[in-house]
Amino acid sequence: MRIPRIYHPEPLTSHSHIALCEDAANHIGRVLRMGPGQALQLFDGSNQVFDAEITSASKKSVEVKVLEGQIDDRESPLHIHLGQVMSRGEKMEFTIQKSIELGVSLITPLFSERCGVKLDSERLNKKLQQWQKIAIAACEQCGRNRVPEIRPAMDLEAWCAEQDEGLKLNLHPRASNSINTLPLPVERVRLLIGPEGGLSADEIAMTARYQFTDILLGPRVLRTETTALTAITALQVRFGDLG
């Protein structure tokens, strides 16, 4: 069996003993049914990975001995801040999971005129917690040792107005530029992905006022979740660490 990778939310140190957090303990003790003497890999978001060994396990708690740690940097040289207008149901979860596997550094859920998601503050907070857990699970699976933050949801214009020294991109079906025509080098990108119905004309004009560049991904119309992953992949191939 592949050695499980587990995220620990507190800083780790070599040659220490810790108790895993509740979610991790449930996964190791109840789902995988692992026991004393079995090996784990732990990471705490600091770009380090630690070998570890289970010392005790029950259905409710798992304690481990942390062994040696080492730096294991798998982050892309391209910092991508994804601004994703929220989509319904599992589409947003899928976008978050796959974007993190592809190396996105930061994700901000957005509200726009045509956003199909209407949540009160309590439900939205629960969604944010759920999305952050999805981000952690994606890092555990793909080998990243830093966990990207899922920021609190924002209004589209407030996000566009934030100061950012990087390249600002907006996907537009009638744009004249493509990712391949963007000048090199690029180290930071703020990538805007609109809702299923697209941005309104006023919103597109607003992004231009904040110096966003419209880009075209190709001749076909893509769903919002496909658009995000296609754009991230193309950016990583041209400016990052794919290909």
UniProtKB/Swiss-Prot annotation:
Protein EC: 2.1.1.193
UniProt entry tagged with the keyword Manganese: no
Annotated localization: Cytoplasm
GO molecular-function terms, A-Z: protein homodimerization activity; rRNA (uridine-N3-)-methyltransferase activity
Pfam families with a match to the protein in the record: Methyltrans_RNA (PF04452), PUA_4 (PF20260)
SUPFAM superfamilies for the chain: alpha/beta knot (SSF75217), PUA domain-like (SSF88697)
Effect of pH on activity: Optimum pH is 7-9.
Keyword Cytoplasm: yes
GO cellular component: cytoplasm
Domain of life: Bacteria
Family annotation (Gene3D superfamilies): 3.40.1280.10, Hypothetical PUA domain-like, domain 1
Keywords recorded for this protein, A-Z: Cytoplasm, Methyltransferase, rRNA processing, S-adenosyl-L-methionine, Transferase
A GO biological-process term: rRNA base methylation
Main subcellular localisation: cytoplasm
Function: Specifically methylates the N3 position of the uracil ring of uridine 1498 (m3U1498) in 16S rRNA. Acts on the fully assembled 30S ribosomal subunit.
Family the UniProt entry places it in: Belongs to the RNA methyltransferase RsmE family.
Subunit field text: Homodimer.
Descriptive protein name: Ribosomal RNA small subunit methyltransferase E
